[in-house]
């Protein structure tokens, strides 16, 4: 999850609000932790199903940056990544053993519109010494 903002489930009008639902109406709870799983997936969102089970064909839909409650959406990482992967693991027997699913969703993180340019220059150079200008 790079350097993006922490996910949250308490304030639907704030950035990074996450929600989840099932197609069966089963009750879910969400917990986000910065160090909730093993490396390299330290940041983790845990979805727990309460008072029931899922059968083949049932689904859980997770909405990152859910805007239905007024959230402006997600603050994503500051660098581009063509194949950002949402690693999905499942504890199908509810015993604390999580196994990765073979197919995981992914998105492309691309730059947005430029709002401000900043020149990055070296602070110490001699007269006539070449330097690089970075934007």
Annotate the PLM regions.
Residues 1-123:
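Ser/Thr/Pro/Gly-rich, low-complexity intrinsically disordered stalk/linker tracts of secreted
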Residues 126-135:
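Beta-strand-rich structural segments
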